């Protein structure tokens, strides 16, 4: 899905809520303008592609336009003058137009949403779908007007009390059926809006206690659910990418999609690896006890590195803080790994992050995204420079040189077994001496490029 050029057209917003703010543009590293990019130059070419093509930035609807700042200890704080707080269709449609006004100013080429982010739930499934269609009409108009595309969409299968025991893994078969209808509608929505993908996140697919759980049966139901989704995707001709997004916990104590390895194991078990890739999130990796680098390498080794949810977490806290990324060391490693494995096809850098409760003004939405886009752009430049100089790859190549010839090559080709290896070592006597892993030396190299 190539990035579309912006189209001329007048927004239908009744009041320009962002008209007093400038369109965000690139001014370079020396700029002190908080309303400008210092590193993200969408037209700059790196490794044969523009920054915009490499990064494929996406704004999420849920955190950016639905987060109120409320938490378990206090009410909402966000100032959103365009939102009257009602669940009316008129308010939902207005909110959608305002969202595209914001994205036009920011300059991101993609966006993403859950079904319930954009339209309220009705009293019946029929009414719910009607509400969604009414807002999708506005979304389609705005996408056509601006050229902003849908990176991926998804369904909220965790918020309503009906999903307390799960959706596809619920002990209630009717809830499974209800979830299936939601995903059916979601896939039809993805097709209608030409989405690049569709994401499954199992926030309630797991357990709180094993005392009341038939794990084997639940996993089999989840596998069957995904096979139904694959079948319907083919039936309607949707050619977007399916993603699973790993997360170990929150809201459920243990989620079945706990990390990249667990997701890959599940996909292999049910013969679905060819149909899915992973949408990896930094904060979820942290909660799973991993780095994002680890999760990306795990997915990429299986050919399943699909898309990225860009955020970060607070290592001092044990929950999903969904902060905007700000660490150059982190983004440099992320972009190095992404470039190493060929970059995105239909995925992108999706800002699944929200401003802090204390950052409550509309201006903060801009500052957060500008910072996130800049730190990823600079991470891309650092990664490309390291690749050009082969700063890490040459060291790794030499480190594994014993596998390129001799007994190492014989092992990799499957030409020897235990008996042959025993004979080899009896003749040689002792293994060749090990060499230093040089971790500190390599960390210094990365810091040299960053600084």
Predicted regions and their residues:
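Gly/Pro-rich active-site loop or hairpin
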Residues: 69-94, 213-219, 253-264, 286-374
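N-terminal small/glycine-rich loop or linker at the start of catalytic domains
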Residues: 53-85, 155-170, 202-209
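N-terminal basic, low-complexity leaders that serve as flexible interaction/assembly modules and, when applicable
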Residues: 2-82, 445
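Flexible, acidic glycine-rich loops studded with aromatic residues
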Residues: 303, 322-451
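Catalytic domains of carbohydrate-active enzymes, especially glycoside hydrolases
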Residues: 50-57, 87-117
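Non-cysteine beta-strand/loop elements that form the S-adenosyl-L-methionine
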Residues: 58-62, 150-156, 199-201, 302-313, ...
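Active-site acidic/histidine proton-transfer and metal-coordination neighborhood
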Residues: 10-13, 43-46, 94-101, 109-110, ...
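Active-site beta-loop-alpha junctions enriched in small/polar residues
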Residues: 62-64, 115-118, 155-158, 203-205, ...
């Amino acid at each position: 899905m190539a990035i579309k050029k912006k189209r001329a057209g007048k927004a239908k917003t009744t009041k320009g809520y962002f008209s007093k703010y400038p369109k965000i543009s690139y001014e370079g590293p020396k700029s002190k303008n908080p309303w400008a990019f210092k590193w993200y130059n969408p037209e700059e070419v790196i490794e044969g592609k523009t920054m915009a093509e490499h990064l494929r930035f996406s704004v999420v609807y849920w955190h950016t336009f639905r987060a109120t700042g409320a938490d378990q200890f206090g009410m909402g704080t966000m100032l959103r003058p365009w939102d009257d707080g009602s669940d009316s269709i008129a308010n939902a449609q207005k909110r959608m137009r305002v969202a595209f006004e914001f994205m036009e100013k920011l300059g991101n080429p993609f966006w993403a949403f859950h079904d319930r982010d954009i339209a309220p739930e009705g009293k019946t499934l029929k009414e719910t779908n009607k509400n969604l269609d009414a807002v999708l009409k506005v979304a389609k108009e705005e996408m056509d007007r601006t050229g902003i595309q849908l990176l991926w969409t998804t369904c909220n299968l965790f918020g309503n009390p009906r999903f307390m025991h799960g959706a596809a893994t619920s002990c209630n078969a009717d809830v499974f059926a209800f979830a299936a209808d939601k995903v059916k509608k979601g896939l039809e929505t993805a097709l209608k809006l030409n989405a690049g993908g569709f994401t499954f996140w199992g926030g309630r697919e797991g357990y709180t206690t094993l005392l009341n759980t038939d794990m084997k049966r639940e996993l089999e139901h989840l596998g069957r659910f995904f096979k139904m989704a694959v079948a319907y995707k083919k039936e309607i001709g949707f050619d977007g990418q399916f993603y699973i997004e790993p997360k170990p916990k929150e809201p459920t104590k243990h989620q079945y999609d706990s990390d990249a390895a667990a997701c890959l194991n599940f996909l292999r078990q049910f013969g679905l690896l060819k149909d899915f890739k992973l949408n990896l999130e930094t904060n979820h990796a942290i909660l799973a006890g991993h780095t994002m680098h680890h999760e990306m390498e795990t997915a990429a080794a299986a050919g399943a590195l699909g898309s990225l949810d860009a955020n970060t977490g607070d290592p001092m806290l044990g929950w999903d803080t969904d902060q905007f990324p700000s660490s150059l060391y982190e983004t440099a490693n992320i972009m190095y790994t992404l470039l190493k494995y060929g970059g995105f096809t239909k995925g992108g850098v999706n800002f699944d992050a929200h401003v802090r409760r204390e950052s409550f003004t509309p201006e903060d939405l801009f500052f957060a995204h500008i910072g996130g886009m800049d730190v990823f752009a600079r991470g891309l430049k650092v990664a490309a420079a390291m690749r050009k100089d082969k700063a890490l790859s040459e060291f790794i190549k030499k480190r594994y040189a014993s596998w390129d010839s001799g007994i190492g090559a014989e092992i990799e080709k499957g030409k020897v077994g235990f008996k042959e290896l025993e004979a080899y070592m009896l003749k040689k006597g002792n293994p060749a001496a090990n060499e230093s892993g040089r971790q500190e030396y390599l960390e210094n190299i990365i810091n040299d490029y960053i600084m």
